[in-house]
Structures are given as structure tokens and as C-alpha cells.
Amino acid sequence: MTIDTDSRATPAPPPQTLAQKLIARAAGRPHVMPGDIVNCQVDLAMFHDSSGPRRLKPMLDELGAPIWDRSRVVLVLDHYVPAQDEDARRIVGTARDWAREQRLPHVYDSIGICHVVLPEQGHLRPGMFCVGGDSHSPTGGAFGAYMFGIGATDMLGVMVKGALWVRVPQTIRMHWDGLLAPGVCAKDMMLHMIGRFGMNGGGYQAVEFAGPAVKALSMQERMTLSNMSAELGAQVGLVEPDETTWRWLAGRGVERVAGDWRSDPSAEAIVHRFDASTLEPQVAAPHSPANTEGVDNFAEVRIDVAYIGACTGAKLEDLRAAASVLRNRRVAAGVRLSVAPASAHDQRVAEEEGVMRVLRDAGADILPNSCGACAGYGGSIPDGANVISTTARNFRGRMGSPTAQVYLGSPYTVAASAISGYISDPRLVLA
């Protein structure tokens, strides 16, 4: 029997998740499957003063190798600025000197935290494959980019070759039905998921956030989801780009590009479902983001310090949320409220909107646009203090003092707690 091979139909490509499509593009393949190991071309590499030059410069000097493409490298000075001691001055000086030596075109010095500055400056768009020298680099996934954190050795390889191998992950879809109530936000969604699945629940796979509640979020709220996918143990935290994405990017000078950056309906994924309409404000107890329960379980916890800061919790949307609670109110006696806006741009807009005035009038101290206490730098958290913070992590000693008890909450919850002196439900203030 003769078979006419020319008449055979071409097999349809297998359905792909968003993560698979992003990796396939970077690998130059029509499709990839979970478990495949592929070599990906890097569109963008980002690092900061702590993770970058002081570690990369000696290794690059030893190799005698040039950077593969300076236009695809972004350096942000955010961890040790403003420098407060000799070690910090040395680290920051090394970064600045190396940036000049390498003639890097994209250097952002003391204007905010890298994960906020990067999209703010128009460096991200859907379809990109990016790496960052920081564990919260998955923030880029909010824009439909495949972005994750890598260490100095892997970053060295990227600097020289512009490529990196990855094992294609499975996709875990966190599907949120319903809509969030006033006073409940993306930070509460993330704390709830981390509390439910633990800090290894993501299994270094690709987490995709989906559903009506996610689509209703602003870009900066989506950034909070992707940012804290790191605390969920995921490699990346993706959100399907939509009109909200492109409108936000257009305001940063990013032109729309074509691409089918969404999961195919029949693509294989592990799906977990949640109802946003029933979610209450969440609080994580010391010393893990996984120690999460509803806010009412912490009503008797007195606080000494309320901190609104970090890439997770001090963006413009976060500052607005805190101000909505603090307006015409004062911080409780004996409580210190510190606010470190995540970027100079967001602080400037917040000034124009009157948000910063509300925070100051409530008694807040305004700190520089940097990682600050989240990175344990600056000695701003007293020993033995009870702290409620908008940061992403509350490991022992994370904010500097090994004896501080750090609780995590949303900007709404932190602000409400600051005015009552106890961990408090912001919905009671906003009602």
C-alpha cells in the first residue's frame, strides 16, 4: 500500500500556557513543553548596587570579557543609598565607577527601587524574557514578561553571552473570581495564597494570576501579585497583558507590539480557585509570610512601628491606600509611622495629588526612595519593637533588628494599625 505523505495534514501545535509561549519565543522554537531544557536569549538584564558591580566586576575583569550588549543592561542604585557608612560608600562608589567605565546607558541612581523603576522607565513590555539580580525580579511578570531572579554566577554568563538555559516549568493558575471589597487589596490576596500553600507552594514553577478579580486590578496592584510570587516559591508570577497593561505602558512611552501573550484555553495547568469577594484583610505573623491569618486574629497585638515601604508596598497605589485611611487622623501616641515611597516619580505624583500631605499631617516620617528598612539597612527598626510593615518578608532580622517582631499587612492595614496602636481592620476605619 502506498501512502501519499504530501497529503498528510500538519499536526496542530500543542496548546501552550503564557509561560511556555514566552520561553518558546526566547528559545527560537515554535513551542516548548514542561520539562524541556532550552537556551533562551535574554532581552534585558537588571541588577542593583548590592547584586551587580561589586560581584560582577571582579569576575568580568578576570575573564577579560566585554558585556554582550550594554543597551540591554539596567543598573539601579537602590539598596545602599543614601550611603550611611563607609561600607555603603564603597559599594555605591564601585557601582558608579563601573557604570562609567562600562558606559552603561541605563543607570538609575537613587530615584527608587529597581522593580518599580524598571517598568516606570519603559524597559518592560509583554513578550520579553528578562533576568534580574534580585529575588523579587518576578515583578516584571505583571507586564506579561518572563522575568525571574538569578545569582551572580548566572548573571555573569548573561553578561558575557546574553543567554541562559531554563527548564520549562509547569503552570499553576491562581484564578480569582469575584471582586475585592474596599480596604482589601492585592497584598491581602498574596498573603492569603502564601498562607494557604506555604513558601514552597510554587515549587519553582510558573504561577499565573487570572480571573475577574485580577483583571480588575490596576497595574501597580498586579505588580504586587507578581512581586510576591517569590514568597510563594515560584520562578515567575505572570499576568496576561490586556488593555490595562498597554494603557499603563503607553504612558511610559512603550509602543504596542503584536503577540499572542495569553494561555491557550486548553493548555495544561494546575488550577486553584479563590473568591475575592469573601477575602478579609490578611496579616502574617513573625517570622514568615506563611504565618498568615485574618486580621481579627491579631487585634490584641500592640505595635511600636508602622512601616510603609518597599517595592511590594510603597508604590503610588499603596500610598493612596494608606492616605485614604489616614486622612484627617493622627498616628497613635507611642507609634512611629515611617513611609519610604518606592520611587521618586511616585512620590512626586503623590505630592501633586496631596497624598504626601495627608501622610505628613498624620505624623508620618518620610524616608528616601530606596529599599531602606526592608533590606535591613539604616538601623531604623528598634530592638524588641513590634512592627507592622508593607514589606514582602518578615524573617527574623530581615529589617535589621534580630529581636524585632515583624508583622506583614497591606498599606490599608498598616495605616489603620498606626492610628489605633494595635493591629487593626482597615474596613472599620473606611466604613
PLM feature spans:
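Fe-S-dependent hydro-lyases/dehydratases of central metabolism
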Residues: 1-431
